[in-house]
A protein has these predicted regions:
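Short, charged beta-turn/beta-strand-edge "cap" motif at the junction between a beta-strand
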Residues: 95-96, 144-150, 154
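Helix-rich terminal scaffold detector
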Residues: 1-66
Length: 154
């Protein structure tokens, strides 16, 4: 099941990369047009578009690099081990049971595989940081004070 989840995450991130790449192309086109067709001496539309295009380009490069890492990441079984990148974790918090996949990228991405909704979290998130190094049946406490129990790790 974990392989199917990771593949679904990769597919969603590839779609996002395509959107970001298209936005980068559009920003570059706006930059070229605005710079050569400025209305006034202080027209900064071209500069703003260039700044935006640069941001999209950096984001695309980072996402592309992270996708390459994700595609080559070995799928490990974390049963009985400390939680680390690549772990699929079931957590009960406040009466709700949720599944999380801990990855370096794609935080907040949600996928559904075999009628199970899984949310990607990163070690930089409060929940990701609380889970890192923890074990099955361990307790997690978030900075907000919310507490939960780790039901399973795979």
């Amino acid at each position: 099941m974990k392989e199917a989840i990771i593949n679904a995450v990769i597919q969603k991130l590839e779609t996002e990369l395509g959107r970001q790449s298209q936005a980068n192309v559009q920003s570059n086109a706006t930059t070229a047009y605005s710079a050569s067709n400025a209305d006034k001496q202080r027209d900064t539309t071209g500069f703003e578009a260039a700044f935006l295009a640069h941001g999209y380009a950096v984001h695309c490069m980072d996402l592309s690099h992270r996708l390459d890492e994700l595609r080559s990441m070995p799928i490990e079984d974390f049963t009985g081990q400390e939680i680390d990148i690549g772990a699929l974790v079931e957590v009960e918090m406040g009466g709700d049971v949720d599944w999380y996949l801990l990855l370096h990228c794609g935080g907040g991405t949600e996928v559904e595989v075999d009628r199970t909704k899984v949310t990607v979290i990163t070690p930089e998130s409060p929940l990701g940081a609380a889970l890192m190094g923890n074990i099955e049946a361990g307790f997690v406490e978030l900075p907000s004070g919310a507490e939960g129990i780790i039901l399973s790790v795979c």
